[in-house]
Amino acid sequence: MELYFGEYQHVQQEYGVHLRLASGDTPKPRNSQPSKAGSYGVSIRVQGIDGHPYIVLNNTERCLAGTPFPENAPSFPSSVINNLSLHPSNGTVLKENTPEELQLPENPYLQTSPLRGQKQFSLHEGRNGVLERKDGPTKLPHVLNFQRHPELLQPYDPEKNEVNAKKHHPPESPWLRNATEDGTNCKKSRNCFPKSYGSQPNSPTSEDLAKTNMTAIRLCSSVVIEDPQKQTSVCVNVQRCAKEGVGEETLSPRRKSPTAPSPQAYSETKKNRPDVLPFRRQDSAGPILDGARSRRSSSSSTTPTSATSLYKFLLDDQECAIHADSVNRHENRRYIPFLPGTGRDIDTCSIPGVDQLIEKFDQKPGLQRRGRSGKRNRINPDDRKRSRSVDSAFPFGLQGNTEYLTEFSRNLGKSSEHLLRPSQVFPQRSVAQEHRGKHSPSSPPAKLQGAQGAHPKPPLQNKDGKVLNKGRQESTGACAPSLPAPNKKEEEIKIATATLMLQNRAVAATSDSGAKKISVKTFPSDSSTQATPDLLKGQQELTQQTNEETAKQILYNYLKEGGTDNEDATKRKVNLVFEKIQTLKSRAAGSAQGSNQAPNSPSEGNSLLDQKNKLILEVSELQQQLQLEMKNQQNIKEERERMREDLEELRVRHQSQVEETATLQRRLEESEGELRKSLEELFQVKMEREQHQTEIRDLQDQLSEMHDELDSTKRSEDREKGALIEELLQAKQDLQDLLIAKEEQEDLLRKRERELTALKGALKEEVSSHDQEMDKLKEQYDAELQALRESVEEATKNVEVLASRSNSSEQSQAEADLREKVLKEENEKLQGRIAELERRAAQLQRQMEDVKGDEAQAKETLRKCESEVQQLEEALVHARKEEKEATCARRALEKELEQARRELSQVSQEQKELLEKLRDEAEQKEQLRKLKNEMESERWHLDKTIEKLQKEMADIAEASRTSSLELQKQLGEYKEKNRRELAEMQTQLKEKCLEVEKARLAASKMQDELRLKEEELQDYQRAEEEALTKRQLLEQSLKDLEYELEAKSHLKDDRSRLIKQMEDKVSQLEIELEEERTNADLLSERITWSREQMEQMRSELLQEKAAKQDLECDKISLERQNKDLKSRIIHLEGSYRSSKEGLVVQMEARIAELEDRLENEERDRANLQLSNRRLERKVKELVMQVDDEHLSLTDQKDQLSLRLKAMKRQVEEAEEEIDRLESSKKKLQRELEEQMGVNEQLQGQLNSLKKGLRLKTLSSKVLDDSDDDDLSSDAGSLYEAPLSYAFPKDSTIASQI
């Protein structure tokens, strides 16, 4: 069988590995060498960075030159190769190698065949991306090359440079006929075919391919070649874990191939392989290498990077199964077999893009030498390392006996190994080979574990496009050896897993087809090498990496499904969690390393005791923390009780304040009622006062008039008396004179009679003029009487109106009626007197002479009457002026009333506004109460959640304690068991070789137990994952609580804003309160002034009452005097009618007029007083309303201020409660974080203990598996030959090394 890779170029810059595959169809270079028997088609160039020599391996020769393949073998035509699609991830295709580049010798087995007409069968690409075999008439079973030429498997002699074909003839195995057949498919990333092979001038024909038995293998995509008989597939998973994070490179699916896994599926299949081990070098004569150096050396020397090495890997396992000791090895190198899942099968280092590689080869075509890829960089002086000698592999000499091998396996991995000189190596190689050849037939055949399944199905995909390869992972985990997950160190680990599924077409009898997953175990018979701790550490680190990646993926999925964060945020969280885990594991790494390096030393007991003491201390610390948490819970409960008591006290205070406000409101209402009553009484007193004042004024006017009349009457009586006395004296004298003059008159009468006759005419004229004057006077008197009558009638009407309006005016009306009656009587009397006067006038006409003397008096009386009329007119004018002034005062009062009404409207509006404000404040208070209730409910929920979290944490802590104790017990038991078994095995190996089989049986039993315990550990890991999920849920709940607290802080800000608004409103209300206080002060000053005026009026009322009583007494006395005077006047009128009648009539007329005027003025005054009283009542009512409103406003403002203070206190208390809750929450979060850290530490310790257990259990297994294996001192590359190849090591290989 021959690999056909086209022209493949691959450069690994990071570790100096150059891989180049060349086939026979390429043109020969200019300076190419002729094809030799030792030429090759695959060249791996390893450039050591740490100072190691580079090694060139050739593993292309698969059969001897003289043994051609059968002619009827199947082949791949060029059309099939042209039909193969490119890898979609590589956008560019590798260019064809120019003659300058390809300086490698060609494959000698590629020969052109003349058989063109022969019928062939071809492989075509099916619908599902599967190569299908079509109509080939001949289906001949194939025999493998090494079966056809068994001398290829014989050991190689480096001295003679040839294969010892006669020493060993390996038997053929029927399994090999079924296992390795005519075609295999290898899947490998970063490889690509050229676009068109048919366009190449030197491409081989189908006959050539048929002749050379060459098989084309797709490396770009996952291809499954289907066979109706059997089928296998090749899957390569490459994974790399860097120090900074997890960098993944997924294989891209092939076009038109549903069976190829997607990138997400591939990433998941990568992560779920815990059985992968990296190959780490072991220093036999010194300490363990640091991370960087060992990483570089192991990656640069052990990991095969070519596609042929991949294919070789599968066939290596098969060959190891058939002939484990017949493989050609170098004597001075330690050998570790290529087991699947050991990390040495595939290189996982970073590979640059194809374009960069092409540019690099194009730039320096002439400098590509055979030995190294280019100019070596200068080594950092810190990284310089002394190269190891190849003589240190066998410290006890190269003897070919069992004693040497047992001693070597006993002291393998220890620092006390002896180093050999280079001169001791080559002379003894043949001896070692002979020894090996002698003992090789005695080794039993290798055990194969092949899991035959049904037809390989494509991997299922979920909604997110992730591949669910649970079945495959379980099968691989069951077949492959289960490896522990060790502590992760600060170094870069490269992991490669390969699951190779072969296809067999040769066997036609078997009808079932299935995927074969091969895991090979070699059980040598002679010696068993002991596994070193650093190798086991490398294995642990690799499985730890995969476990950590699976845990990371699980955490990422949980966080992504449960939370709403971005992918970056979730990745950061996962990385932070694993960084904490790494720090905890790095702390515990020292103790684990000590236990791994010296498993048989007594320091393990001390380390376990130290760990036990540490665990006891941690348990005590956790108990102390739990006690502190309980104390904190008790304190929180006490604070809650205190808060409840404070709330109850506040409620009681609130109720008491409400009751006090109710009592104060009742008192206010009572005081307002009393004030109203007192104001009504004051109003009545003022009304009575005004009435008394009016009555007093009337009486004063009447008294003044009476005094005037009395004065006038007194004066007139005195004058009349004096005049009468004088008249009497004169009458006496006249009588005397008359007696004297009688005589003289008689004398004169005679003379005068004469004169009388003369004068009669003159007297007649004078009497007529006098009569006319009297008529005029009569007419005037009649007119005045009529006016008086009309005024009397009007007065009666007004008196009736006044009587209907008020009872008080009835008395005055009765008095007026009496006065009217008196006046009527007096008028009647005056009329009688007028009649009498007329009679007297007739008499006066007779007595003209007597009247002449009286005329002068009458004229004087007339003048007096005129003067009185003028005075009355002036009094009328004065009364009109007073009326005008009263109207002006009335208008002013009306204006004041309007202003008072306006003020009342304003006050009512302000009252309405204040009521609205009060309602708003009440609503705000209710809102604050609701918020407070909500806060209390939220606090209650928070307390509940905190209690739940504490309970869960306590449960987790108890579970961790119990698990740690159980694991410690199990560790002790396992350690004792392992020590006993190791002692027994060593004694049995030294004494008898037959007891090895018993030990193997015991190891198999131990493996079963280990599997059971691993299942238990997996269950425990699942429980831990469930605990992690619970913890994540708790963290999510904590985040929700944080969001709720943030929302509450926003509500708090809103409350602060509302409080600020309320404070602004309160400031405004305070300003208004100050203004109203100033107004209230002004009103209080007005009230005091009004009260003073009231007191003054009361004193005046008392004085006026006293004066009224005095006046009434005077009135009574004056009425008596009037009666007396009237009687005297009547008496005097009777005596002096002639002189007195005119005056009395005039006086009566004047009195009537004055009375009429007084009555009119009294009416006007009464109306004005009524209007003034009404206005004053209104003003008083307004003042009372203003006072009441002012009092109510002051009370309301006081209540509002008290409420605001209470609300402020409540808000402050709520803020304090929120702060307390936040502080308690922070404390709980800190405690949770501390407990999480403690749990993580415990989990790390548990993991370390589990890993120690796994290492100890695997140590016995490694002893069984590594009997015949040689480990290279410098971690050099392994040289193995696949089943269908023979690799003779000639002089060219020695020169290249």
From Swiss-Prot:
Composition bias type Basic residues, residue spans: 367-378
UniProtKB keywords: Cell junction, Coiled coil, Phosphoprotein, Tight junction
Coiled-coil positions: 604-1251
Residues modified to Phosphoserine: S113, S203, S257, S284, S298, S299, S389, S392, S482, S678, S704
Superkingdom as given in the UniProt entry: Eukaryota
Pfam families: Myosin_tail_1 (PF01576)
Localization terms from the record: Cell junction, Tight junction
Region: Head, residue numbers: 1-550
Annotated Low complexity bias: 297-306
One GO term describing the cellular component: actin cytoskeleton
Tissue: Widely expressed. Highly expressed in the kidney and lung.
Region (Disordered): 161-208, 245-306, 364-396, 428-467, 586-608
Compositional bias of kind Polar residues: 197-206, 592-608
Compositionally biased spans, kind Basic and acidic residues: 268-283, 379-389
Notes on the domains: The head region is responsible for both junction and actin filament-based distribution.
Quaternary data: Homodimer or oligomer. Interacts with CD2AP and SH3BP1; probably part of a complex at cell junctions.
Family: Belongs to the cingulin family.
Job of this protein: May be involved in anchoring the apical junctional complex, especially tight junctions, to actin-based cytoskeletons.
Protein name per its UniProtKB record: Cingulin-like protein 1
Gene symbol of the encoding locus: Cgnl1
